[in-house]
């Protein structure tokens, strides 16, 4: 079926409530700087857009859940919609447990490309401050029911996952207002069943990690 689908560029939008769709990039006309913009998605009451990717139909979208599972979908399998449509609920597209929730998304190139999967990693962070780096190669064989991406300890959950080249700086931010920055290369690669290592020490029981970003070191300029 892949050979019958044009590998065109598309815009993937995902709402806070978990509605997803893809729309041809050609539907979005170029505007001058300072333009009013174009509507990219319709949303239900009290919902809003949270994620946006530009990809091609033959790429993969990886879903990571709060319980630490990973699911895959070819981009062309994402329901197609117009700029104003609301999309489909992710829960109806993948075999996710009813008490689990997708927390992070990664868009990747061809998972059959050995050079690509051997030169990239997935780095994850949990609410309680654990971080883990795993070679992308360990996620290169999609399964319909998903796989375990990280072992989540009791009272913890996955909050973010990022694709890296192994040459990034990682920043973790916590609710108490603190932030830690470290070199990705100092985090050794681990298997999918590992629970990771301590990335940041929380201030108290009420503190938690609220976000993680990764920046390629080639894009960092020190002042």
What are these regions (language model features)?
Residues 1-223:
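Short, structured "edge-of-domain" segments at secondary-structure transitions
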């Amino acid at each position: 079926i892949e050979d019958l689908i044009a590998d065109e560029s598309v815009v993937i939008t995902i709402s806070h409530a978990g509605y997803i769709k893809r729309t041809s990039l050609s539907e979005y006309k170029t505007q001058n700087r300072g333009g009013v913009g174009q509507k990219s998605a319709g949303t239900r009451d009290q919902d809003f857009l949270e994620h946006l990717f530009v990809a091609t139909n033959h790429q993969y979208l990886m879903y990571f859940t709060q319980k630490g599972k990973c699911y895959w979908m070819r981009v062309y399998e994402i329901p197609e919609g117009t700029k104003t449509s609301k999309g489909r609920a992710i829960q109806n597209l993948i075999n996710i447990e009813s008490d689990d929730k997708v927390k992070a998304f990664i868009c990747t190139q061809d998972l059959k490309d050995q050079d690509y999967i051997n030169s990239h990693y997935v780095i994850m962070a949990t609410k309680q401050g654990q971080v883990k780096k795993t070679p992308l190669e360990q996620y290169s064989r999609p399964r319909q029911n998903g796989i375990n991406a990280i072992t989540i300890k009791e009272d913890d959950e996955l909050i973010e996952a990022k694709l890296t080249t192994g040459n990034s700086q990682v920043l973790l931010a916590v609710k108490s207002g603190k932030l830690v920055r470290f070199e990705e290369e100092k985090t050794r690669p681990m298997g999918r069943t590992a629970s990771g290592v301590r990335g940041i020490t929380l201030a108290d029981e009420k503190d938690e990690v609220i976000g993680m970003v990764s920046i390629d070191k080639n894009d960092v300029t020190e002042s």
